[in-house]
Amino acid sequence: MSNVLRPALSLIVLMSLITGVAYPLVVTGVAQVAFPAQANGSLVYDAAGKVRGSALIAQSFTGDEWFQSRPSAGAFATVASGASNFAPSNPALVTRVKEDVAKLANASQEPVPLALLTTSGSGLDPHLSPEAIAWQAGRVAAARQLPLEKVQALIDANTQRPLIGPPVVNVLALNMSLNQLPSAPRNAQL
């Protein structure tokens, strides 16, 4: 019996050390050398060197002076990430969307873009379409007392055009660019 147990236990210990210690350390080391920014969470820093968020995770922005992210089913918490999985007929979803439409409705009476009313699959998508961002441009320009053309130029400068897929705008990067403008209100801090 001992002849059977000893090799089995030795294999368990050896494989635990390889897969639980050695492999993670090697992968972490390679990632830190080859892709240090991504390995550390794709953190975004302001001019003072303070972490303002991650380029890969959405966050909530409140106030008319900021571009708003997509809604999050998990309140932008990474632990509770994910979609609500409500059916279109679910009263809770209908109520939330109606509240969001009322909150977002602008003076131009243009329909609210769907991306500003629906959560992403993860609930943490940091990107919006240029159209959803442009829909908010008038509100942001008015709140910051900027010409609409200047805000639109900032949107164009922050629009990413991937090789595959539609153009997108990272909301955090755009808001940080807004904050770099000389006309940024004193109370408008990320």
From Swiss-Prot:
<keyword id="KW-0633">Potassium transport</keyword>
<dbReference type="GO" id="GO:0008556">
    <property type="term" value="F:P-type potassium transmembrane transporter activity"/>
</dbReference>
<keyword id="KW-0813">Transport</keyword>
<comment type="function">
    <text>Part of the high-affinity ATP-driven potassium transport (or Kdp) system, which catalyzes the hydrolysis of ATP coupled with the electrogenic transport of potassium into the cytoplasm. This subunit acts as a catalytic chaperone that increases the ATP-binding affinity of the ATP-hydrolyzing subunit KdpB by the formation of a transient KdpB/KdpC/ATP ternary complex.</text>
</comment>
<keyword id="KW-0472">Membrane</keyword>
<keyword id="KW-0630">Potassium</keyword>
<keyword id="KW-0067">ATP-binding</keyword>
<dbReference type="GO" id="GO:0005886">
    <property type="term" value="C:plasma membrane"/>
</dbReference>
<keyword id="KW-1003">Cell membrane</keyword>
<keyword id="KW-0997">Cell inner membrane</keyword>
<feature type="transmembrane region" description="Helical">
    <location>
        <begin position="11"/>
        <end position="31"/>
    </location>
</feature>
<protein>
    <recommendedName>
        <fullName>Potassium-transporting ATPase KdpC subunit</fullName>
    </recommendedName>
</protein>
<keyword id="KW-0547">Nucleotide-binding</keyword>
<keyword id="KW-0406">Ion transport</keyword>
<comment type="similarity">
    <text>Belongs to the KdpC family.</text>
</comment>
<keyword id="KW-1133">Transmembrane helix</keyword>
<keyword id="KW-0812">Transmembrane</keyword>
<dbReference type="GO" id="GO:0005524">
    <property type="term" value="F:ATP binding"/>
</dbReference>
<comment type="subunit">
    <text>The system is composed of three essential subunits: KdpA, KdpB and KdpC.</text>
</comment>
<dbReference type="Pfam" id="PF02669">
    <property type="entry name" value="KdpC"/>
</dbReference>
<dbReference type="InterPro" id="IPR003820">
    <property type="entry name" value="KdpC"/>
</dbReference>
